[in-house]
Amino acid sequence: HRVDRRQRQMCIRDRYNGLVQLDDGLNIQPSIAKSWTISEDGLTYTFNLRDDVFFHDDMAFPNKKGRKVVAEDFVYSFERVWKGSINSPGGWIFKGRVAEENPFQAIDNQTFMLRLVKSFRPMLGILTMQYCSVVPNEAVEKYGADFRKNPVGTGPFKFKRWLENQSLFLTKNKNYFEKENGQTLPYLDGVRVSFVGDRKTAYLELIAGKTDFMSGLESSFVNELLSSDGELLSKQSEKLTFLKSPFLNSEYLGIRFNGEANNPLVNKKIRQALNYGFDREKMLRTMRNKVGKPANSGFTPIGLPSFSYKKAKGYNFNPDKARQLLSEAGFSNGKGLPTIELLSTKDYEDLCTFIARQWEDIGVKVQIELEESATLREKMKNGQASFFRGSWIADYPDAESFLTVFYGKNPAPPNYTQFKNVAFDAIYEEALNENDDTKRYALYNQMDKILIEEAPVVFLFYDETAWFVKKGISGLSKNAINLLSLKKVKK
């Protein structure tokens, strides 16, 4: 079974396990932890571990046989991330959240305890992330900096071989602990991950039958796969299956708030005019073949339980309203309004050009400047981008993961717009301490209403996954975090 390079991070999940995992509905399910309890104050999490989970067989162990996972392994694995002993981008998950002294404790071999500084309802969701996977200290100490080239986990597939920038080979873990209908997983004997340089190449290899799976689309080939209504073309339907579902990714144009005083976007009416001034439905139909939904209910995307079209009503296409707002801002028909510079990357040039042309009709002129992805991210981080194309993908399945982007005390990232709003911040802090989901979701809706009113971004669309799977393959299921798990796949 082969996949393209976009799935490399996804395949990490099939080499490791954590305490808990997500199902396709983004509900928390047991993994190595078979059960857990949370104290009434929300500060202490106690996990009861399975006693039939073993690390992959490896040279790091006596007789090359993987040993049983115990609670102390989670203490070790979490402390590696928390203390920064590894160059992990996941250090933030525990920072400021766990107790300063002994936050991770092994009560006995099968009982692991985690202690927080203050209650944080999304914590279980965070524990599903790959950073919270368990690893054996023996392998980390044996391989040192080369552990990434010799990974040892507990997942359904184990590392076999890596040809850098070419291929990653995984093989079946015959000692894996999960079963389906009494049969031990996984079903596949192995996986080959091909490191393809770009999506166009991935598409060509998929069509040629060299790969079995591809995720994502680009304008260079989207019309070869999908109709303008988002349906798989008949010429492809004999060879491929198309799977589409909500993806927790909000696409937007960000506006830096503490920018130059002469920047017209400091005027809220102009920001609102931009949001009214283009047709999201047409944009998605003509530019993305209906992969995605118009972002007309705030920043929190479809796919989260707190999402509501009714409770947070955003912007629709209303050019007359846009012109009225421009007039109220002192720029009737755009007269006197300077050209606005929009920073983007090459892969979003077509989409930004579409929007800019529609804005011309209401009197707003936009000049698109293209940057390399790394350069644009650096400018966003350093406050050098006044108007920029951005996206935000959920780290964990809770709206807090999106709303934190606008919390005034956060740096860039995640707060690239440097948005500060006293009311928003107060509600955000209240939501962090609210353990009742219904009440917390209501607070999330209030924050989205503030974002709609203040318009620190131009809301573009809520993304959707686009998976193309070779006929004859079963067991792949759709989920809103775009996770690829191969443990139940059959070919």
In which residue ranges do the predicted regions lie?
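Aromatic- and charge-enriched surface segment that lines or borders ligand/interaction sites
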Residues: K34-N87, M113, A202-E205, P264-L265
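A bilobed periplasmic-binding-protein/Venus flytrap-type ligand-binding module shared by bacterial periplasmic
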Residues: T171-F177, S245-A273, G277, T286
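Structural transition elements
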Residues: F157, N262, K268, K293-A329, ...
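N-terminal lobe/hinge region of extracytoplasmic solute-binding protein
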Residues: R5-Q9, R13-E40, E79, I86, ...
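A structural "hinge/loop" feature
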Residues: R5-Q9, R13, I32, M59-N63, ...
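Surface-exposed binding/hinge segments that line
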Residues: T37, E72-D73, R80-N137, R161-L163
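Aromatic-rich, solvent-exposed beta-strand/loop patch
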Residues: H56, R115-S133, R148-T201, L225-S250, ...
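Detector for C-terminal structural segments
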Residues: R121, L163-S167, L243, E251, ...
